[in-house]
Amino acid sequence: TPLLHTPGQFSFLTFQHDAEAHPFTIASYYQDKKHLRFAIKALGDHTHSLKKELKIGQDVIVEGPWGYLDFNIQSERQVWVAGGIGITPFISQLEYLKNSGHPLCPIDLWYCVGQHDDLQYPVNLDLLCTAAGVTLHRIDARMKLEAKHIMMESDNSQNVHVWFCGPAGFAKSLLSGLQKYGISEKAFHYDRFNMR
């Protein structure tokens, strides 16, 4: 059965080896709606076990989609900030833009990664951003991304909306800095999906 979803949504997945459903962001946007891709990083006991327990062709129960990240907000510029595996909702929006046409305003994607594995995912991110008309900025997470970096690249535009998916402490720090540049909390869209 096709799963109708919009970029940025998540589903609950139940695997054969575990009766409990767990939430994961959908990291794809296929026009045929017959395929889904999830990016799952080993962050806890359950996600660590998946690499060992999952087998190709295994049945998985998919519930949802749930959640809503609205990327269709009018602004002079959009800024997307992803911390590590927080890139997943942006991947689905990039695929949507690639298939439906370029964005209506400039978009900057700031991808903050620290570990070597994160630098490799997704392998086609540069190409995907180019095809979607989005400017990619890769930042080593050990170097702190600050509001001043974002605002310099945004030509200090006042009508900027920011979408964030990553650690809560990073979100709080970034929002505090952006508010000093006149970016309101209403213009800061934070994916608070932090269940594991």
Regions from the language model: what does each represent?
Residues 63-74:
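A short, basic/flexible loop-to-alpha-helix module at the beginning of a structural domain
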Residues 49, 70, 89-92, 173-174:
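Phosphate- and divalent-cation-binding pockets in alpha/beta enzyme and binding domains
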